Amino acid sequence: VDWPTAAFWQELAGVYPDAKIILSTRSPESWYKSISETILAAVWAPDKWPAPAVEWFRMASKVIARSLGDAQDKDAIIAAFTAHEAAVKATIPANRLLVHSAKDGWEPLCAFLGVPVPDTPYPRTNSKDEFFEHIKKADDI
C-alpha cells in the first residue's frame, strides 16, 4: 500500500499477521527526489490546492512528522527512509516479505503472491504529473 498507509506498516502487520508484505524499494536518493517533488512540495504549500486536498495535506504533515521527522532536512529524511527499510527487513519474517523494486517487474511479485504473470507490461504510475493531477481533481469531490 502506498503512502501514507506505509507509515503504519507495523500496526498493519500486527493486525494482519498472515498478510504478505511487499516492501517497495529504490535508491534513497531517487526516493528523496520523488517525495520532495510530490508529497513534500504539496505539503509545504497546502493553501494553493483545492479545499478538499488541504485537509488531506494537514493529515499528511502529521504523518510525515511521525515517520520522517524534520521534513526540511534531506539527510534526516534519507536516514528515516533507510531506517524504515531496515526495520521492515528486520521485523517481517522472510516468508511474509518481498523486497521489490519496480525494475524487477512482474515475475518476483507474482511468484510471491502465487498468481500468474500478466501478459501486460509492468505499469509505470505514480509519476509527479499524475500526483498533481490527482490533487487538482480533489476539487471535483
Model features per residue range: what roles?
Residues 1-4, 76-84:
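Soluble or luminal CAZymes and related metallo-dependent hydrolases
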Residues 3-7, 103:
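Short beta->alpha connector loops
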Residues 7-10, 84-86:
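A generic local structural motif
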Residues 8-76, 107-115:
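PAPS-dependent sulfotransferase catalytic domain
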Residues 22-34, 39, 49, 86-141:
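The conserved 3'-phosphoadenosine-5'-phosphosulfate
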Residues 69-72, 84, 88:
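Short, positively charged, low-complexity/disordered linker segments
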Residues 71-78, 94-99:
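Active-site rim elements
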